[in-house]
UniProtKB/Swiss-Prot annotation:
Upper lineage: Eukaryota, Viridiplantae, Streptophyta, Embryophyta, Tracheophyta
Keyword Disulfide bond assigned: yes
MF terms in GO: cysteine-type endopeptidase inhibitor activity; peptidase inhibitor activity; serine-type endopeptidase inhibitor activity
Protein name: Kunitz trypsin inhibitor 5
BP term (GO), one: response to insect
Record's GO cellular component terms: apoplast; endoplasmic reticulum; secretory vesicle
Source species: Arabidopsis thaliana
Pfam families to which the protein is assigned, alphabetical: Kunitz_legume (PF00197)
Keywords associated with the record: Disulfide bond, Endoplasmic reticulum, Plant defense, Protease inhibitor, Serine protease inhibitor, Signal, Thiol protease inhibitor
Length: 196
């Protein structure tokens, strides 16, 4: 009986220790060279699947209250514009599934725009505000999640405990020949290339 109790206790310690180790480990997002994405460093966001456009950039579509939308460049050879990532916790590296601001420049922070009644889409614009996690900035926070062997961008902010948010992947919606980023059931599979 005592040997059975000993085995049970040993198993319980092993399982609890393993669970703590797994939860404590934070996996960083990696670029195409296998290096961790760093806060404040420029990266291109590129599509993994080729043949449908290039990297991500901005376009003034003159159809919204925030005139600048995030789009996928129509030219496959284009890397788009570099972005910087700023995690809510100010960590040096960008962990997978952590709330981050994404910005093309200091004044072009990604934001989930208001619902477009005409297209029935939630588009991504660049009228957000950096930092200040909370109710007033909840639409400015995105996550980079693993998707198969690559990554996807997801809107599912957790910076506001009492805010009701939509949780969906970011994909592409084609409108008037422009490949606009919008919330979607079909995520855009992406990779990250450091801009030097």
């Amino acid at each position: 009986m005592s040997s059975l109790l000993y085995i049970f206790l040993l198993l319980a310690v092993f399982i609890s220790h393993r669970g703590v180790t797994t939860e404590a480990a934070v996996e960083p997002v990696k670029d195409i060279n296998g290096k961790s994405l760093l806060t404040g460093v420029n990266y291109y966001i590129l599509p993994v699947i080729r043949g449908r456009g290039g990297g991500l950039t901005m376009s003034n579509l003159k159809t919204e209250t925030c005139p600048t939308s995030v789009i996928q460049d129509q030219f496959e050879v284009s890397q788009g514009l570099p972005v910087k990532f700023s995690p809510y916790d100010k960590s040096r590296t960008i962990p997978v599934s952590t709330d981050v601001n994404i910005k093309f420049s200091p004044t072009s922070i990604w934001e989930l725009a208001n619902f477009d009644e005409t297209t029935k889409q939630w588009f991504i614009s660049t009228c957000g505000v950096e930092g200040n996690p909370g109710q007033k900035t909840v639409d400015n926070w995105f996550k980079i999640d693993k998707f198969e062997k690559d990554y996807k961008i997801r809107f599912c902010p957790t910076v506001c405990n009492f805010c009701k948010v939509i949780c969906r992947d970011v994909g592409v919606f084609v409108q008037d020949g422009k490949r606009r980023l919008a919330l979607s059931d079909v995520p855009l599979k992406v990779m990250f290339k450091r801009a030097y």
